């Protein structure tokens, strides 16, 4: 049954009623059920749903249910994000406004609570409780109040911001609202100083931006390629950068700068100058806080260039102030290290060069800046001429003039000018860096003037540092600037350049220099000598260089005249190359545009598919949520019913009174039932303990009371016994008197009624006479009816008993019949089982007998094969000797130059035959005759003549020796019938002697080439491929004089084919149509007459149809024919289709 759902209007009205009676949770549940219902999604407009949504969010804010508010907002977004975006925006802004108002109210309440606490007792401000709390937790009263009152609302407001950002991040119509909420979240973090939330917010926004960049062409409607989206993201990141700087989160500020640079690089439109100026200003501030003076000065220089070029209304004072800032920041850059390769030995994630390159990219520089390059750029931009006289002197003293004795005094005057001038407050952070650079300049200049100097003298020259700072700077100069300095603490002196074997690198430091160090002079003396000698040669031979130049000029002119024509043609050809290149580039551009169009089309198609998939996933997600909501609603309903049921009992009310509404919602029905049972058990235990204690108490009091009551009871019983005796005596006396009076009244009444006896007797006699006749008449009627009913019941009883006896007889008869049938069925089943068992035993006996016969036959055949092999070897030897003798005779009588004999009509020549003069050869087991190319085989008749091969006798069917039909498909007779057959049927050879019956055939001495050629052609009857394979496997001679192909016996050495397994017969069984054709051919063969089984010993191979038969064929008996028909009708495995091997 479907669950009852309310309409939105009714739900809103009912929620207001719940709010009025002080049940906001019930009101929120009522509205939530409406939102969970899917029926209203597209059935009502925003004018109906929007007030309900505001009330829903108001209740969520009041109860601090941010997760329930998130669910409702997502449902509202899915409904109205494509219909009415303004309604969605109003709802979200209203929700955040309510959350902010409650948070501000909580903050005011917390401050008021602290004020009340502080003004509670003016005479005793530091109470013991406040002192202990401050010592334990280190917090003041305001912090504790904020944690208890303000912090829950701050958390709720933070969750609200995160939910709204997650809600609007993929909606292209709400981009402006998304960025406004992001700025509101930044203001929230600034107002309440939430640094951890600010970091999480930055990560969240960065993740959203990455998702937009990755999936701009897939599932989201927000595209980073749009100019409006890029500008909104850029403004948000700039606001993020300002907020991070205000909160002093420099790491987040740097990440924001990276995001801003990426967005500016992605944008096709150049950012406005105001944005770039703000970017460089914030970047310079971040670098300054990071302590990177080099990139700080580079950022200020970029800002100065941008302001100078694009700001038209820049005043002279502003320009002078900016120039002084840039110049002082550049001069404050520490002197570069002479050993930058030392950083390679420090393990870090990235090398300093990679980091510098990354920072240079943020400034738009092709390569990382250096102090020297920045000073050159400052001079190129004429910055020293734009600043005041003091700062211009500062540049000259540090970078131009060489005056180490007065350097620190001069710089101190500039430092005093910066510190005393209120307009120079922006330059104060550079004072310490400027002093360090001045000390390093002083040390370098002193090292070029003095070989050694006293420590006190150097301290006098470096007036703004003490001995420890000076020693530290000396060590740093040796470590980083590759200077030769040795400190002698014993003599309190400093030595410069004492080791002449060491010198500086080829890299020379910037700044003013008077002369080279002694070690540098020794290192470069060869270079100086080369320079001097070159100058001397030019003075001694002033015309040599001029003559060399004239000669070189003439060579160049002559070479030009040689190649000017080729060069002219090359220049003309270059124009054609340029045109071809332009055409090629144009084609490439067209192809690229087409490819881009195809790619965009493919991307749009993929985007549509992805959008469709997303919609399907959202639909599935909505269905899943709907299902979950329904399950949750059912659970809540059952929970409510369970709570209502429990609340009707006293212990249930007591248990529910201990839980609030939140606790009840967190429990399910089982947990509530469990708590109810626990409450019952606890109450039972408490009652039992109370009863036990009460029992002890009552027992004590009762025993004490009984002890005290015993004398009182004894006195009372004695008095009561006396009173009872007196009362009994009085009562007994009264009773006796009353009995006597009653007796006297009864006797008087009896005497008075005795005179009425005669009248009574007369009345009874008259009544008996009157009623006697009526009684007799009724008695007669009753007896008649009784007799009729007795007869009727007797007749019915006779009929019923007769029918029962008949039914019992029929039932007994039917049971007897069924019993007999069951006995017959059981007897038949027993007979069938016995017959089946007998047949099985008979088959097993036959199989065993057949197996023994097969083994015996196999042994005989193996013996016969052995004998045949011996005969074959003997015959081969005889043939070999005969062939040698014949060859000798032919060599003796061969005519000189005569032609060879021509081939016979049969296609077999004398050269091929190479046989003895006698053309007849007999072999065991059959007869084979070859004569002039004709080939006749008897015993399964086979004739070949002149390249033609004919097989007769039912397609190469062979006659059996046992007198039966020799067809290769015969009925399998039992062993008893085969045993009963006559042993000698007039056949010339028995089955044991004829080893080829059912096994291998006779050895064939056939011609190799002729037979192979004949076998390749079509056959008249059927394919003889398997037979040729069998002939080849028998290992017979291909020619009369040729060697045997193989001497291995056949894998199956013959034997009775009836002994073979039946499954092979069934596999080789041919279709019925082929069997019918074979039967027809056998019938035709029988009509023509059986072929002779053995040819005459001197027969010449005449017509085989006219050849006389050597033995009579016994016709098949009628019984066998009938049995054969029966077997053909039902093929139960006794008929097989075995190929003779």
From Swiss-Prot:
Residue ranges occupied by any PCI domain in the UniProt entry:
319-501
Location of the region described as Disordered in the Swiss-Prot/TrEMBL record: 588-631, 829-1141
Compartment list: Cytoplasm
PROSITE patterns per UniProt? PCI (PS50250)
Q: What is its main location?
A: cytoplasm
Any single Gene Ontology cellular-component annotation: eukaryotic translation initiation factor 3 complex, eIF3e
Phosphoserine occurs at: 908
Q: Name one GO molecular function term.
A: translation initiation factor activity
Alphabetic keyword roster: Cytoplasm, Initiation factor, Phosphoprotein, Protein biosynthesis, RNA-binding
Q: Which domain of life, per UniProt?
A: Eukaryota
* GO BP annotation list: formation of cytoplasmic translation initiation complex; regulation of translational initiation; translation reinitiation
Task: Output compositional bias ranges, type Basic and acidic residues.
Answer: 588-623, 829-899, 920-976, 990-1051, 1059-1087, 1110-1131
Reply yes or no: does the keyword Glycoprotein apply.
no
Could you tell me which InterPro entries the record lists for this protein? EIF3A (IPR027512), eIF3a_PCI_TPR-like (IPR054711), PCI_dom (IPR000717)
Do the record's keywords include RNA-binding?
yes
Assembly and partners? Component of the eukaryotic translation initiation factor 3 (eIF-3) complex. The eIF-3 complex interacts with pix.
Q: What does this protein do?
A: RNA-binding component of the eukaryotic translation initiation factor 3 (eIF-3) complex, which is involved in protein synthesis of a specialized repertoire of mRNAs and, together with other initiation factors, stimulates binding of mRNA and methionyl-tRNAi to the 40S ribosome. The eIF-3 complex specifically targets and initiates translation of a subset of mRNAs involved in cell proliferation.
Q: Which family does it belong to?
A: Belongs to the eIF-3 subunit A family.
Q: What is this protein called?
A: Eukaryotic translation initiation factor 3 subunit A
Q: Which organism is it from?
A: Drosophila sechellia
Cite the source lineage: Eukaryota, Metazoa, Ecdysozoa, Arthropoda, Hexapoda
| Annotated gene | eIF3a
